[in-house]
Swiss-Prot record:
The gene is guaA. Gene3D superfamilies: 3.30.300.10, 3.40.50.880, HUPs (3.40.50.620). SUPFAM superfamilies: Adenine nucleotide alpha hydrolases-like, Class I glutamine amidotransferase-like, GMP synthetase C-terminal dimerisation domain. Its EC number is 6.3.5.2. It comes from the Bacteria. InterPro entries: Class_I_gatase-like, GATASE, GMP_synth_C, GMP_synth_GATase, GMP_synthase, GMPS_ATP_PPase_dom, NAD/GMP_synthase, Rossmann-like_a/b/a_fold. The keyword Magnesium does not apply. It comes from Flavobacterium psychrophilum (strain ATCC 49511 / DSM 21280 / CIP 103535 / JIP02/86). Catalyzes the synthesis of GMP from XMP. ATP binds at residues 221-227. GO terms for molecular function: ATP binding; GMP synthase activity. This is GMP synthase [glutamine-hydrolyzing]. It catalyses: XMP + L-glutamine + ATP + H2O = GMP + L-glutamate + AMP + diphosphate + 2 H(+). Pathway: Purine metabolism; GMP biosynthesis; GMP from XMP (L-Gln route): step 1/1.
Length: 509
């Protein structure tokens, strides 16, 4: 695959959004840590430097080696990147009189600049910095200003180097995508050839070449990612793909058999393994979220390994890993830190001695769905909401018991079926219920009750990197609340989670 654009990560919360905006232009891009620049740059057509929570003026400033990039490849420096180029190339960066966060407008744009084609004066941009460029670097030419930031954008004469102090990737920068397109397509002349059809064609060919006649084993989860990965691999190697669908006892109500039947109907070579009792036994008494995740991961590997050994001469383990999994799980030296262990990355024990193949690891969730549609996968299956690998275990706060799982499965079924019946399911990116570790007082009939509280969660998102809570109709929430309390024994109170990501995560654990 042609890696057309290289994005260097300095720890900004917005780095992944840069990648999303670039992908929306049908341009492939990849994120690398600032201190792990690929040695072979011949496959890249342009480079983007991201933002950072660090200051270029501090002792712990992050220093990329741009010796093979600067002046040799088209370069766009965003925020910290723009300040870095200025500070270490003859310019001056100083602390701003006031910290500049939020909306601003371009009050000056240099005429006849390709970077600002189809961008009007007063275009809104998003600022997020506490330093400002007081003096441009050597050969710097000012391209744009805001009311408070004189050098909001500049270029370096004699180079294809551009720099901006705002964030074009953020939604609030109304012409940000246009600026990225101007830089990548018109200035850097990057081809716009990263499409679902092209990906399928390239990946199937790549898998055929890599796997040859080797046997591959894949753990199916019922979700979109592993399903699309399975169909891609099936197209490439056919009967040499062996799929295992493990029931960990923490799936949605009646999901194991219905999904297993779907897989068989798609022609996949799949075996269903019901290990629910084993998982629940191992989880008994565990309340800590990380311990839950790791226990589920360990038991899954044990079950999966037992089943894999039945298949002779397996050489590869396939996984449905996607790009946000990789981004959230990799700790980058300096700016980044792992928030929580991710259920789709890592955990493979050495004794399995299988090589890893991850056909989707460079795709965002919405791209996976488009690839699935290209592969002809049923729209209903592709439209399934994301569901965490640890299943309902991380939606049961506190310890896990079969009784709690049953309650949550019933609550979840009422909620999800209600969304479908009211035409709301496809308007929501992800939805589910959370069983809280508290009881509340209620009244049913003439009796006082002291029963469980559940929270409902519904979010809208593109790829799970950020998410907003969905404004479900009050009438719908009222009906679902009543249905849950009336139909699910042991629940007497329902609340609705209105937190966005960030600062909250989509899942509660």
């Amino acid at each position: 695959m042609q890696h057309n654009v290289l994005i260097l990560d300095f720890g900004s919360q917005y780095t992944q959004l840069i990648a999303r905006r670039v992908r929306e232009l049908n341009i492939f891009c990849e994120i690398f840590p600032f201190d792990k620049i690929p040695t072979d740059l011949s496959i890249y057509k342009a480079v983007i430097l991201g933002g950072s929570p660090f200051s270029v003026r501090s002792e712990d400033a992050l220093h990329p080696d741009l010796s093979e990039i600067r002046g040799k490849l088209p370069l766009l420096a965003v925020c910290y990147g723009a300040q870095y180029l200025a500070h270490f190339s003859g310019g001056e960066v100083a602390a701003s009189n006031t910290r500049e966060y939020g909306r601003a407008n371009l009050t000056y744009i240099k005429e006849n600049e390709t970077f600002f084609e189809n961008v009007n004066l007063n275009s809104q941009v998003w600022m997020s910095h506490s330093d400002s460029i007081k003096k441009l670097p050597t050969n710097g030419i000012k391209l744009a200003s805001t009311q408070d930031v004189e050098n909001a954008a500049y270029k370096i004469e004699g180079e294809t180097t551009y720099a901006i102090q705002y964030h074009p990737e953020v939604f609030h920068s109304t012409d940000g995508k246009q600026m990225l397109e101007n830089f990548l397509v018109k200035i850097a002349q990057v081809p716009q050839n990263f499409t679902p059809n092209a990906f399928v064609s390239d990946m199937v060919a790549e898998l055929k070449e890599k796997l040859q006649d080797d046997k591959v084993v894949l753990g199916l989860s019922g979700g979109v990612d592993s399903t699309v990965a399975a169909v891609l691999l099936h197209q490439a190697i056919g009967k040499n793909l062996y799929c295992i669908f493990v029931n960990n006892g923490l799936l949605r109500k009646n999901e194991f058999q219905s999904v297993l039947d779907q897989y068989k109907g798609m022609g996949l070579n799949v075996k269903g393994v019901d290990a629910g009792d084993r998982f629940l036994s191992e989880l008994a008494g565990i309340s800590d979220p990380e311990t839950k995740r790791k226990t589920i991961g360990r038991v899954f590997i044990e079950v999966f390994d037992d089943e894999s050994k039945i298949i002779e001469n397996v050489k590869w383990l396939a996984q449905g890993t996607i790009y946000p999994d990789v981004i959230e799980s990799v700790s980058v030296k300096g700016p980044s830190a792992t928030i929580k262990s991710h259920h789709n990355v890592g955990g493979l024990p050495d004794y399995m001695k299988l090589q890893i193949v991850e056909p989707l690891r460079m795709l965002f969730k919405d791209e996976v769905r488009r690839v699935g549609a290209t592969l002809g996968i049923d729209a209903e299956l592709l439209g399934r909401h994301p569901f965490p690998g640890p299943g309902l275990s991380i939606r049961i706060l506190g310890d896990i018991t079969p009784e709690k799982v049953q309650i949550l499965q019933d609550v979840d079924a009422v909620f999800i079926n209600g969304l479908k019946e009211h035409g709301l399911y496809d308007k929501v990116w992800q939805a589910g219920a959370i069983l809280l570790p508290v009881n509340s007082v209620g009244v049913m009939g003439d009796e006082r009750t002291y029963e469980k509280v559940v929270a409902l969660r519904a979010v809208e998102s593109t790829d799970g990197m950020t998410a907003d809570w969905v404004h479900l109709p009050y009438e719908f929430l009222m009906k679902i609340s009543n249905d849950i309390i009336n139909k699910v024994k042991g629940v007497n109170r329902v609340v609705y989670d209105i937190s966005s990501k960030p600062p909250a995560t989509i899942e509660w654990e």
